[in-house]
Amino acid sequence: MGVHVETISPGDWRTFPKRSQTCVMHYTGMLEDGKKFDSSRDRNKPFKFMLGKQEVIRGWEEGVVQMSVGQRAKLTISPDYAYGATGHPGIIPPHATLVFDVELLKLE
């Protein structure tokens, strides 16, 4: 499956991230059953990563690049685009499909 992007609320439909730009995001990460495992919103601190530098899972790289600034979306990410057979011990089980509620706040 890879990553499926479902728009929750639209962005500007003009400003899309490019490689080597820093994406400033808010997110909530959940397992497929809805169990939350992480949230930048809970910390009230946006998360930043540079696109194309493999700082995040493949599902984020391929999902966020499809978003425009201001857009909020649901990313459903298959295990092979997330943490695969290993998972993330104590947080994400092996072979887990992940669901993220993400918002692209701005680009730097």
From Swiss-Prot:
PPIase FKBP-type domain: residues covered: 20-108
GO molecular function: peptidyl-prolyl cis-trans isomerase activity
PROSITE patterns to which the protein is assigned, alphabetical: FKBP_PPIASE
GO terms under biological process: negative regulation of activin receptor signaling pathway; negative regulation of transforming growth factor beta receptor signaling pathway
Annotated GO CC locations: cytoplasm; sarcoplasmic reticulum membrane
The UniProt record lists the keyword Isomerase: yes
Keywords: Isomerase, Rotamase
EC number: 5.2.1.8
SUPFAM superfamilies (alphabetical): FKBP-like (SSF54534)
Record bears the keyword Isomerase: yes
Reaction catalysed by this enzyme: [protein]-peptidylproline (omega=180) = [protein]-peptidylproline (omega=0)
Xref: Gene3D superfamilies: 3.10.50.40
Protein role: Catalyzes the cis-trans isomerization of proline imidic peptide bonds in oligopeptides.
Family per similarity comment: Belongs to the FKBP-type PPIase family. FKBP1 subfamily.
UniProt protein name: Peptidyl-prolyl cis-trans isomerase FKBP1C
Species of provenance: Homo sapiens
Gene that encodes it: FKBP1C
